[in-house]
Amino acid sequence: MFLERGYIATTLEMIAQTAEVAVQTIYNTVGSKRDVLNGVLDLSAAGPSAPRPVREFMQERVAATQTTAEMIGVLADWFVEAGERTAPIQQIIRQAAAVDPEVAQLEKQRARQRFENYKLAASALAERGAMPREMTREEAAGLIWTIGHPGVYRFFVLELEWPPARYRAWIESRLLAQFG
């Protein structure tokens, strides 16, 4: 509904009516409209058949890799997968953040959440001895965050019309240049 009508025009009453529940049920189970938007982003990121939250299954994917190059391949795959699934809802969040302080706060929280998740990836790289000696884990997380940012996907794939395979190869080459 957010994608069809936009954030501002979508009300909790509309969402409740579509879901055939009372508005109070949404408040009790999910929370505010901002919380619903956050939940939509979570579901979009995880994908339709995700068995667990993103953080958990990504840790499993990374742990299953044998080499740094394989791990970087997992990250590159993830950035493409997540970009494809979340680009539309990320656009809604970006637009709504410009006019709604609660959504602006959500956007900041999600950016921080991605950064914290990429600290885990940086730690995995450090454990493999793949980080340059002068680079801190926080700096490595910042580099991964920057390369994997939803805005980078939007620019290269949606605006420049790069095929996802080219975008993936670009991510992989940039990360391998730093950590490979």
Predicted features along the sequence, with ranges:
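Hydrophobic alpha-helical connector segments
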Residues: 33-35, 39, 46-84, 141
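Hydrophobic/aromatic-rich alpha-helical bundle segments in the mid-to-C-terminal region
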Residues: 126-173
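Solvent-exposed, amphipathic alpha-helical segments
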Residues: 1-4, 57-61, 89, 143, ...
